[in-house]
Amino acid sequence: MRDGREYLREVVEPPAWRDDIAAFSILDQYEIPDGYVFGWQFRAPVIEMPLYMPWLRSRVESLGGTLRQSFVEDLSEVPGEVVVNCVGLGARELCQDDEVRPARGQVIFLDQDPGIGHFDQQPETLTYTIPRSDVTVLGGTAQVDDWGMDIRPEENELILDKVEALWPELDRSKIIGGTVGLRPSRSE
């Protein structure tokens, strides 16, 4: 469980999930960074995919499940009583779903713990710090229809500038890497 703060540029109703988590409170004005007018603090689980996915695979196999990675041209080719379709962007071809589009995400890895996560989830200013057990993930970008997989230095600068607005204690000398990934998205 980790604490996080989400900052907003307008006052809104608290989210429906507020009663479903361990802790939730509205921030006092002095806790809100410049440029924002409202926000909340919460305690919620953080799932670290590099740790969770191997555990999940092991769990499925220990319960008698099998995992198979292969090239599939049609879902009817796949045997099994239950098939979990995890093709992501591959749904464009496999499922003839032209609405699935890439959303390019670039993040930075930092060897500095902010203590809590910081979030601005608005699409035009998407910003986050996600503390994990080994690094803090800084983000981000969500560039729809961008298939580019190279790390772009100008995007790193944008991410760092946005994060510093939420977390002024950021130490740029603690950057240890970064990555780019493509998430499936759709316009609906």
Residue map of PLM features:
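Flavin (FAD/FMN) cofactor-binding and adjacent substrate-gating region
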Residues: 1-60, 186
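Flavin (FAD/FMN) cofactor-binding core of flavoprotein oxidoreductases
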Residues: 3-13, 160-188
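Small-molecule pocket liners
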Residues: 5, 104-108, 127, 136
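A short, glycine/Asx- and small/polar-enriched loop/turn
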Residues: 16, 78-81, 185-188
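FAD-binding beta-loop-beta segment adjacent to the flavin cofactor pocket
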Residues: 19-29, 112-127, 131, 172-188
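A conserved short coil-to-beta-strand element within the FAD-binding core of flavoproteins
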Residues: 65-79
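Central helical "cap/lid" subdomain
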Residues: 76, 80-122, 143, 149-156, ...
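Short FAD-binding loop at a beta-strand-to-alpha-helix junction that anchors the flavin cofactor
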Residues: 130-142
